[in-house]
Amino acid sequence: MAAITAALIKQVREDTGAGMLDVKKALTEAEGDVARAKEIIRAKGIAAAGKREGRKAQEGTIASKVVETANGETGYAVELNSETDFVAKTPKFVEFSEEVLGYAVDAEANSADELLEAKAGDSTVKLAVEEAAALFGEHVKVGQFAKISGEHVEVYAHKKSAEMPPSIVAMIATDKAGAAVAHEAALQISAMGAKWLTREDVPADVVESERRVATEKSLAEGKPEKIVPKIVEGRLNAFFKEVVLLEQPFVKDPSKTVGDLFKEVGGAATAFARVEVGKGEEE
């Protein structure tokens, strides 16, 4: 049996990310065999991972990348969640998020579900994530997934602080002319959180709901019935300016809209996506 030294424990900890006590127990069980100790940590960790799945995992990071395609470019953004920001900011967690992103690109995945079933070496991404949960000692999961394509795709990754990984990723697809203002548009998406590209993209039920609320509010305020329709249209336009990207006032110059930016360069935006850590569907 090999001696279980502090150096040996440190080596296995660095290789696996497991806690000191778990590493010491694994090395003792493996009689000092490093490879066997890693197997024990992995096996026990995966078994424990199932117990963590009920916990909230709303911290994390977003890995993003733009790749060239036959028709232009495609942008990917993948959210990887952990329970704490302590784990989220570790180099190993950030590195793993980049690996998961790579699997998404390799598989040309179109959704989080497709990504989980994609190959990860000799395994699947789903199993790789379960193994990661074991190593980090927290519930780890793939969260939001975004993919857009166009002649040009611009990505902006926002960090809330220097020591933290990206917590917001904004992507926008444009034609070639629109590429000139794509970065400014991506900054706008990150900061202002638009939900739709044009007002035509807003679902009819959402518009009708806003119309009803605006009507009821106007009547409750005692506005004369004959002018209520005009007031309602004004409030709907204000709603569109808030949620529609191309109608939002440009943050750096509110005298113009984001749509005006593209008109000035003779370009167009064709799609966009925004992913923010912890803002996906409730678990």
From Swiss-Prot:
Q: Looking at the record, which segments are called Involved in Mg(2+) ion dislocation from EF-Tu? A: 84-87
Q: Name one GO molecular function term.
A: translation elongation factor activity
Q: What InterPro entries has UniProt attached to this entry?
A: EF-Ts_dimer_sf (IPR036402), Transl_elong_EFTs/EF1B (IPR001816), Transl_elong_EFTs/EF1B_dimer (IPR014039), Transl_elong_Ts_CS (IPR018101), UBA-like_sf (IPR009060)
UniProt GO cellular component terms: cytoplasm
Keywords linked to the UniProt accession: Cytoplasm, Elongation factor, Protein biosynthesis
One Pfam entry for this protein is EF_TS
Q: Give the location in the cell.
A: Cytoplasm
Which SUPFAM superfamilies does the record cross-reference, listed alphabetically? Elongation factor Ts (EF-Ts), dimerisation domain, UBA-like
Chief localization: cytoplasm
Q: Which PROSITE patterns match?
A: EF_TS_2
Q: Show the NCBIfam families listed in the entry.
A: tsf
The UniProt similarity line reads: Belongs to the EF-Ts family.
The protein's matches in PANTHER family, at most eight in alphabetical order, are given as: ELONGATION FACTOR TS, ELONGATION FACTOR TS, MITOCHONDRIAL
Q: According to its UniProt entry, what is the function of this protein? A: Associates with the EF-Tu.GDP complex and induces the exchange of GDP to GTP. It remains bound to the aminoacyl-tRNA.EF-Tu.GTP complex up to the GTP hydrolysis stage on the ribosome.
Protein name per its UniProtKB record? Elongation factor Ts
Which source organism? Bifidobacterium longum subsp. infantis (strain ATCC 15697 / DSM 20088 / JCM 1222 / NCTC 11817 / S12)
